[in-house]
């Protein structure tokens, strides 16, 4: 496959730890619902269908996910507004199968048991388009090595983005890591519609989906 004309010419498979950009969007009205720590015994859910949602933004990807029996969603997000929105949703509906973690996923991933997740969703992550900010992109060999240990054998990782440079660079990283060429998917699978996707569609941007196993 020929590189897309907007794809960066040079892509690095970073092996160092990604740099976490600590920029929480905190508002006073959310101050009572954020930064709470809920300690749960994750091992008792090992036999469930566990979904890891990384960077759920304002929460649409979690709130709009179709509920099925024996399914548990674990959402990781750094921004307080999205965390507060999902916590309000959980508390209002008295939902018990959604767990929220605020902070850096590169650190939080260490807290999960090995062989735990069936699915990983990474929908419309921050592309960090400026070259000097590429070190903040978390899909690197460093993170993939960690993530792989947390996945069950028949796992599925789903990445979606409308940012051409980001998705082609990510595809390059994955091709190197997996030592094979993965292709873009022609279908969205069970990906819920989010605010970011609606925004991309309004701009008539192409949405790319990468679906693979680690």
Model-based region annotation:
Residues 50-107:
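SAM cofactor-binding core of SAM-dependent methyltransferases
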Residues 119-137:
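A short SAM/SAH-binding and catalytic strip from SAM-dependent methyltransferases
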Residues 170-172, 177-214:
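Class I S-adenosyl-L-methionine
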């Amino acid at each position: 496959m020929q590189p897309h004309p907007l794809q960066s010419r040079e892509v690095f498979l970073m092996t160092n730890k990604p740099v976490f950009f600590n920029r929480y969007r905190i508002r006073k009205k959310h101050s009572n619902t954020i930064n709470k720590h809920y300690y749960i015994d994750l091992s008792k859910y090992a036999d469930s269908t566990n979904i890891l949602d990384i960077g759920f933004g304002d929460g649409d990807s979690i709130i709009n996910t179709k509920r099925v029996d024996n399914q548990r969603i674990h959402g990781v997000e750094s921004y307080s507004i999205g965390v507060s929105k999902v916590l309000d949703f959980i508390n209002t509906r008295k939902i018990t199968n959604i767990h929220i973690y605020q902070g850096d996923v590169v650190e939080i991933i260490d807290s999960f048991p090995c062989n735990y997740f069936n699915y990983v969703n990474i929908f419309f992550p921050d592309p960090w388009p400026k070259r000097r900010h590429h070190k903040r992109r978390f899909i690197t060999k460093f993170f993939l090595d960690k993530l792989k240990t947390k996945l069950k054998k028949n796992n599925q990782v789903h990445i979606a983005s409308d940012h051409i440079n980001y998705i082609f660079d990510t595809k390059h990283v994955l091709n190197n890591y997996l030592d094979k060429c993965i292709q873009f998917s022609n279908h969205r699978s069970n990906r819920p519609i989010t605010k970011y996707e609606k925004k991309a569609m309004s701009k008539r941007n192409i949405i790319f989906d990468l679906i693979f196993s680690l």
